[in-house]
Amino acid sequence: MAAGVDFGDLELFEAFDPPEESTPKPVHTRFKDDEEEEDDDDDENGVGDAELQEQLRRCEATIEQLRAENQELKRKLNILTRPSGILVSNTKIDGPLLQILFMNNAISKQYHQEIEEFVSNLVKRFEEQQKNDVEKTSFSLLPQPSSVMLEEDHKVEESCAVKNNKEAFSVVGSVLYFTNFCLDKLGQPLLNENPQLTEGWEIPKYQQVFSHIVPLEGQEMQVKAKRPKPHCFNCGSEEHQMKECPMPRNAARISEKRKEYMDACGEASGQSFQQRYHAEEVEERFGRFKPGVISEELQDALGVTDKSLPPFIYRMRQLGYPPGWLKEAELENSGLALYDGNDDADGETETGEIQNKNVTYDLSKLVNYPGFNISTPRGIPDEWRMFGSIPMQACQQKDVFASYLNSNIQSPSMRSSGKRSSSQSSPNSPKKQRKEGSAAASPADMELDSDVEIPPGSQSSKAFQFQPPLPPGTPPPLPQGTPPPLFTPPLPKGTPPLTPSDSPQARPAASAMDEDALTLEELEEQQRQIWAALQQAEGGNGDSDVPGDTPLTGNSVASSPCPNEFDLPVPEGKALEKPVLAEPQEPAASVDTAGPEPSCSPAAGAAVLSQREEEAAAEGGPGDALLDNGGVLNMNMSNGSNQQPIHPDSRPPMAPKTHSPVPDMSKFATGITPFEFENMAESTGMYLRIRNLLKNSPRNQQKNKKTCE
């Protein structure tokens, strides 16, 4: 029967909701059914009407009580309601400063006037600071989420300007101050959203009753030693370190205090201070984790079962083999080259070239991933479409990947042979010319005679070439990449100076001549010219050896007693481009008139030539043999008849020479750069003055002994 009675009053909510429209009161129409009509007919004494009247009286009493409460709420709400019609231009300054609720307390009653004066003094102080320093008075304090906005009186129509300035009437703090404590209901706003910059946010320190964990009944409480604070080992102060200690150093005290500190740190941590970690311990701790094997815990965490592939397998098909596990299977070489005196071709590197590290892989450490690099077990579906992936790739199979790693990794010998093949493929490259020149000009190679001729293009002739140690009279080889020096032997007596037409630069056609152009007579004449130049270089070291009309060039000091002037290697490529002899090509009769008549038969000429080659090998040093082999045999590019060139291997074998393994004393001065004097006027001509004294030097004496032998 209570369904037909309304409870509550809309007037209670008028203070919170704006009165937009007059809400009509609901009208309840109650229809009686047949049973109720029968009951009403039975209530002849009016019992039903009495109960209804009693309910109406109770409802009216409740309504009166709610009206009284509504009036009380309206009166209290007026205290926290902003006044209407106030325009605020600056929300940070023009709004209300604070709202004070004076309670019924003797202190607030007594100091009521002082509180108001204090507020007014704060306003004056702020205005003065704003005039002096604007930045000091600028704060970015946004209302906190717990702030409350003061509502305006709803009986007055709101203006747009007042609606836009509701931020000025936000309550950002509500504190009840008691004599012993205060109760903050809203908190405080943060300065620049930073609690450290906001005053009043210090964390209170409470008294700690228990410093250790309370043990269970029947167990002893284990007190853990505290870790000592770092302090000065010299004086014991905690305010500075030992290096900043003003007291004099006491080594014994410092050592003792340091030992105590280390022991205390070890006891506090429950283990040794200097603990060592071993790989075996790590393997035991993480031994249950194996790559490619999914445990039951991991399956539960991923939400997969034994009958499905994990989701990361489908992602691995797109990304490839994990690089971390590939690094585990990597066997990296240090890249250091060890030299034992043998010039191995494997360790041969060019100047400025960095030796690459040889990286190999242990194929047994490749991880098996079912569904990625090995086939999926039977009964497990491949759901790559559902995960947006790709099917299994044949290139990602374990055996294919292993063969790929083996094929892409070159051994050092393969890499060096590839380097040699690349140099052989380009005959005009400077690297090849340097290598061939050094191989042709080596004195040790000049003394070797082989019965079996190996084709120069074969791989065995390059990879398996015997390289004996250098003889004592041979200087160390120049570093690779150094341009070969051009030497000009001394000119014989009576030789006119060079003319521009006779210079080697003016005769480019001579370098392009055919090898079969010289006759035997011309070869013998050129050989005599070389021997005359060598004899003058060996025997005549005085100033009278060089005629006065001979111009001094940069290489005219070749007649000095330095024994290394003919020992340096001359590349073959340079020998083919320019003639070895720098003197002008004169007729044979004008150069050497005292020489024997050349033989007309080729056989006799060849015999004479081979005999003189043997004499040159016996008399001259390794440098003479170098000029003999590198200059005379390569003289077949001048003009002449179609005489066939004489091959170096066709001459009779020479007896091997025995040399001391210790280099000559004069070889230790090779490569020393002379000191250039600043005052060139005083140093000019000094060498010519002391040249006669240098003839008796130990170097020349040793050289003369070798010549006599």
Curated annotation (Swiss-Prot):
Keyword set includes Membrane: no
Gene Ontology BP term (one): RNA splicing
Biased composition (Pro residues): 468-499
Principal location: nucleus
Residues covered by region (MTREX binding): 661-709
Region feature RBM7 binding, mapped onto this chain: 289-302, 312-327
Coiled-coil boundaries: 48-83
A Pfam family matched in the record: zf-CCHC
Localization of this protein: Nucleus, Nucleoplasm
Signal peptide bounds: none
Record-linked PROSITE patterns: ZF_CCHC
One Gene Ontology molecular-function label: zinc ion binding
Keywords: Acetylation, Coiled coil, Metal-binding, mRNA processing, mRNA splicing, Nucleus, Phosphoprotein, Spliceosome, Zinc, Zinc-finger
PTM annotation (Phosphoserine): residues: 601, 660, 697
Biased composition (Polar residues): 552-562, 635-645
Spans annotated as Disordered: 1-47, 409-518, 533-667
Biased composition (Low complexity): 410-430
Zinc finger (CCHC-type): 230-247
UniProt biased composition (Acidic residues): 8-20, 34-46
Gene ablation phenotype (knockout): ZCCHC8-null mice have a small brain volume, cranial deformities with domed-shaped heads, and severe hydrocephalus with ventriculomegaly. Defective turnover of low abundance RNA polymerase II transcripts is detected in developing brain of knockout animals.
PTM description: Phosphorylation at Thr-495 by GSK3 is triggered in cells entering mitosis.
SMART domains according to UniProt: PSP, ZnF_C2HC
Physiological role: Scaffolding subunit of the trimeric nuclear exosome targeting (NEXT) complex that is involved in the surveillance and turnover of aberrant transcripts and non-coding RNAs. NEXT functions as an RNA exosome cofactor that directs a subset of non-coding short-lived RNAs for exosomal degradation. May be involved in pre-mRNA splicing. It is required for 3'-end maturation of telomerase RNA component (TERC), TERC 3'-end targeting to the nuclear RNA exosome, and for telomerase function.
Domain remark text: The C-terminal part (659-707) contributes to MTREX RNA helicase activity, in part, by enhancing its RNA-dependent ATPase activity.
Family the UniProt entry places it in: Belongs to the ZCCHC8 family.
Protein name as it appears in the record: Zinc finger CCHC domain-containing protein 8
Native organism: Mus musculus
The organism's taxonomic lineage, starting at the top: Eukaryota, Metazoa, Chordata, Craniata, Vertebrata
